[in-house]
Amino acid sequence: MTQRIREAERELKYEEYAGREGDIVTGMIQQTDARYTLLDLGRVEALLPQSEQVMFERPEPNARLKAYIVEVRKTAKGPQIVVSRTHPGLVKRLFELEVPEIADGIVEIRACAREPGHRTKIAVYSNDSNVDPVGACVGARGARVRQVVTELRGEKIDIVPFSDDLPDFVMKALSPAKVKEVRIIEETGTAEVIVPDFQLSLAIGKEGQNARLAARLTGWRVDIKSESQLAQEEAYGDVDWAEGEWVVDPETGEQVWKPADGGDAISADDWTDQADDESLAETDAGDEANEAENASEEE
């Protein structure tokens, strides 16, 4: 009889959480080790694996924590609830809790790109022309977004308006950088972004973070170049070594030129020096040709 009662209790606990993947739960931290953190949800416990924890967060015993349910497993000992602090869905759910317009369906989060503990970008859309989606998420004096940032332990959040116009969406996704032009290359799935020289570092972001998040948010590869780089490419586009693209070096976060022929990548300064050398060589060749022509005429 006791065994049946226990089985019935386990079944009730499982049914309480079955199908709740994608929900947020609030629990109290019980214990932490190298593998996972245990959250007390009341009647059951939740597992927060190390892989689902934000690197910079330090769970403190008895502290309350919100987490995102990623899986509910049925085991012989009862339900095993696996939660996450790194899932992009956590950000979406936190905004639902803080923004009534999202909970009511007036404002939608159309896309979300996240690097946990560092930065998140969300694209929002309003189904009511009288409601500003960005303003609704930010709140009066930033009160709403501040609550989300606090729960995420200071993670930066960029809120941009969603747009069906791809160039416009890419431009907004690279906020806070100011973009001059976006060219869509359908064949390669690339958005070529042109920015003023002084905006290049901001558009790329620290270690390429802003560009990466913008690419994930839009679903397109984002190739950022300054006006000077574009001018140089167009000037030397017929030169073999000039064929390639600007990419972000994952180790330094700086832009480097990757030749199309698979050669070694070069820095922006080296690219400019090489372009100047090419220009000088062309000038010298032109001067020699003119001198030869003049000599021929004199003869």
Where are these regions (language model features)?
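RNA-contacting regions in translation and RNA-metabolism proteins
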Residues: 1-299
